[in-house]
Amino acid sequence: VYKRQIMLLDKSGGNIDSLQYVKTWDASLSIVIEGNENMKAYLWCEVMLGQGGETYLGDIASDTIYRINKKTNGLFPILLRTPSVRDSEGGKYYLRLEGVTSRYYFLKCQISSLDMTDMVIKDDKSYSLVYDRQTGEIFRPTFRNKDFPSEEWSYTMRSNGEKDCVYQTLESFALKEALEEGQLEGSLKTVAQGLDEDDNPVIMVVRFR
């Protein structure tokens, strides 16, 4: 495993944090297996996130998520988690910044310990959160496509991607099955009618108004 020596310098107070408590740039998830509790899996988490022309710093070992000023390289705190990730209770999950739009912060509460039974990893405790920058509300989002209303879908936000949009990957074979079952409507139905089951996935771009 490649390791880098990293320190955090407070430009205003001059204090230096050795960050010795940062074990890795990846989230280490402990997977419990019957008869073998020493096995671990590793989930890669992006530390620097570019969204809408801005850059954000969200290390999973830190309680604070920052926006970076490109001109001064200053760090401006935007979100603070409680309890601390270094507390026994707070250490049960990692908080990840997944994306930013003009109005929302998209977050993921990733549980730090997973159960694995019969070679199947079970993760039913991790969940997504959205912070409304206008109202200060925090809620768990549910996304549905009006052309595929029976299916709840997950999103992907690309680092340095286009401002105020998310992406969804739709497998061609799944769209063909949904088409045959009469679950598709509108533009998505038209797209599915022109697909073969072994075609490449369809990438849908969702723009926030």
State the predicted function of each range.
Residues V1-Y2:
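Short, small-residue-biased leader/transition segments that mark boundaries at the very start
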Residues I6-L8, I65, S126-D132, I203-V205:
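Hydrophobic beta-strand positions in blades of beta-propellers and related beta-sheet-rich domains
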Residues S30-E54, K92-Y105, Y155-E162, F208:
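Structural signature of eukaryotic scaffold interfaces centered on beta-propeller domains
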Residues T55-Y56, M116-K122, A192-D196:
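Short consensus segments that form the blades of beta-propeller domains
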Residues G91-E162, Q168-E171:
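Loop/turn-rich, solvent-exposed surfaces of beta-rich toroidal or solenoidal domains
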Residues G161-R209:
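Blade-level signature of beta-propeller repeat domains, shared across WD40, Kelch, NHL, RCC1
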